[in-house]
Amino acid sequence: MWTDAPRHETDDDLAVTLRSLDLFAGLPSHELDELATRCDVSSAHPGQVIQAQDVPVRLWHVIVGGHAVVQRDGTPIGLLARGDTWSEHSLLNGLPSPTAVVALSPLTLLTLSRRQFFEIPEQHPVLAGRLVARSATSADRLALLV
């Protein structure tokens, strides 16, 4: 199973990275700076499982570099790239992930724990709205409908 790698970027570098991603576009600088202090930087190598299928979702990730595949029962159902996230629906609802996410190339990820993820609505209301919208169309929610 995948584990966190040591943090290699400063909070300032992370804030710059967040600003460059569509999900965080237009958020106030002070919110991005604060969010950057909460994010961990992690990495994965090709073939590494980032989220296993049928396992509770405990972390929320944003891809900042590389590509991953979303699989259900070993069958690819989607691709993820820079700026993509997954499992919002499962994380929000305390459900096991109906899909697996596997690195296709070396990945760099920004990661929040489930507890940190649940702090977003209070501290970052605009971002919270965007995440709820993404949850409605996330691969893990759509996989439940199949």
Kindly give the residue locations of the regions a language model identified.
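Cytosolic regulatory regions built on CNB/CRP/Popeye-like sensor folds
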Residues: 1-146
